[in-house]
């Protein structure tokens, strides 16, 4: 029975960064990378991932491209509520590993499997398209806070961008 258990269910119970929304492959919030290609983890069974390289948002925390992607999302104000953000980040990471300077249409296609109810996607698209134009050490928040009308980084942005923001569905009773 173990091979038929859903990967999304395993992640939902054991790690909190990969968010499981619809559990039907429609929303994309549970997107992970399998052999560097985005997949909805809720549609994958444990039997389908044997001998595959699986990456979750937690597993890419040291990846330089991921670090730059988080910074670009923060600069562009691309993270809103945070439920879809890990899935969007993982889809964008797969694209950027193949193409460091994607065209808008390529970004739109790469992100088309993840639904976001909070944004019009433009900030997200801009963040992905501009990720390799920023530097890892660029500190925008301290500079922007000195100017009226400039964007400041969200105080809760880091948790939304790395998947550590905890939502109601992420809680489990002790010893469950």
Q: What is each model feature region?
A:
Residues 1-11:
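Single conserved hydrophobic/aromatic residue that forms the stacking wall/gate
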Residues 12-28, 60-83, 98-117:
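Immediate flanking context of iron-sulfur cluster ligation sites
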Residues 15-16, 27, 114, 122-127, ...:
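Cofactor-binding beta-sheet edge motifs in enzyme active sites
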Residues 22, 44, 54, 171-176:
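A broadly structural signal marking compact, well-ordered functional cores
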Residues 29-60, 86-110, 121-137:
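Iron-sulfur (Fe-S) cluster-binding segments and ferredoxin-like electron-carrier domains
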Residues 50-52, 76-78, 175-176:
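Short coil/turn connectors at secondary-structure junctions
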């Amino acid at each position: 029975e173990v091979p038929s258990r859903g990967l999304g269910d395993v992640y939902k119970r054991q790690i909190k960064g990969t968010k499981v929304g619809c559990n039907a492959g429609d929303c994309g919030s549970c997107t992970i990378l399998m052999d560097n290609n985005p997949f909805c983890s809720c549609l994958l069974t444990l039997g389908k991932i044997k001998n595959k390289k699986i990456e979750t948002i937690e597993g890419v925390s040291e990846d330089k491209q991921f670090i730059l992607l988080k910074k670009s999302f923060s600069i562009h104000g691309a993270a809103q509520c945070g439920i879809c953000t890990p899935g969007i980040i993982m889809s964008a990471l797969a694209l950027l590993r193949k193409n460091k300077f994607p065209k808008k249409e390529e970004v739109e296609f790469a992100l088309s499997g993840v639904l976001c109810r909070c944004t019009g996607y433009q900030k997200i698209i801009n963040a992905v398209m501009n990720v390799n134009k920023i530097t890892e050490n660029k500190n925008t928040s301290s500079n922007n806070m000195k100017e009226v009308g400039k964007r400041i980084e969200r105080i809760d942005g880091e948790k939304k961008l790395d998947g550590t923001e905890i939502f109601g569905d992420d809680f489990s009773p002790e010893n469950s």
